[in-house]
């Protein structure tokens, strides 16, 4: 069966395009923690697309407690690096030109009644993951950083009362080297261990 769709002045054969479209699993497998970036800024349209991916992320009971701060100036990047000096490089974390600080208005988050678990950690993690995958789709490298001093981040970025920082998503165009997918697969637990029976 052949399926044709008019597109502008062209006729596009969708079956021909099938092999060109990356599926989600391919995208997820291509992602790796990037810690070296090119010395160039990320275009505003790309930043906007990544933020939008986070904005539409699901949350417990649709409470949407997550908030995102875009750190893309030398001053803001330096402040981010001060929250974890171990990762500081070239005035940023890993020298990245762009960092998203992902926070939660914790009082707005859903609380599980049986044990009072606040969903902020989960909700912000979903936001971070969706932003990370959109960044990958846009050709950026990313590194999800939780190892930073949250109280210092609150102070450095003058976060309002009740807003707590959970993650930093470090982004930029990756340096020439690319992580070996086979090596990454070797470090990932096998399916037989992943599934509980």
Which role does the model predict for each range below?
Residues 67, 148-150, 167:
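Residue-level "edge-of-site" marker
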Residues 24-34, 43-46, 167-197:
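C-terminal helix-cap and adjacent tail motif
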Residues 46-51, 56-127:
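Glycine/small-residue-rich phosphate/adenosyl-binding loop
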Residues 6-21:
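Short, Lys/Arg-enriched N-terminal segments with co-localized hydrophobic residues
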Residues 153-166:
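Short, electropositive alpha-helical surface patch
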Residues 54, 100, 115-156:
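Small-aliphatic-rich amphipathic alpha-helix that forms the alpha element of a beta-alpha
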Residues 104, 147, 173:
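Short secondary-structure boundary segments
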Residues 3:
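Cationic, low-complexity basic patches in intrinsically disordered or flexible, solvent-exposed regions
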């Amino acid at each position: 069966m052949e399926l044709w769709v008019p597109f502008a002045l062209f006729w596009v054969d969708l079956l021909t395009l099938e092999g060109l479209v990356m599926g989600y699993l391919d995208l997820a497998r291509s992602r790796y923690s990037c810690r070296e970036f090119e010395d160039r800024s990320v275009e505003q349209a790309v930043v906007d697309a990544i933020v939008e991916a986070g904005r539409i992320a699901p949350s417990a009971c649709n409470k949407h407690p997550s908030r995102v701060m875009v750190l893309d100036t030398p001053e803001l990047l330096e402040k981010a690096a001060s929250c974890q000096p171990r990762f500081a490089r070239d005035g940023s974390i890993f020298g990245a030109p762009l960092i998203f600080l992902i926070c939660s208005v914790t009082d707005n988050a859903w609380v599980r009644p049986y044990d009072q678990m606040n969903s902020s950690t989960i909700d912000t993690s979903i936001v971070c993951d969706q932003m990370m995958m959109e960044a990958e789709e846009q050709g950026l490298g990313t590194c999800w950083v939780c190892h930073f001093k949250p109280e210092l981040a609150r102070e450095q970025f003058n976060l309002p009362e009740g807003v707590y920082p959970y993650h930093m998503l470090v982004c930029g165009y990756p340096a020439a080297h690319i992580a070996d997918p086979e090596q990454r697969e070797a470090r990932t637990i096998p399916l037989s261990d992943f599934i509980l029976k």
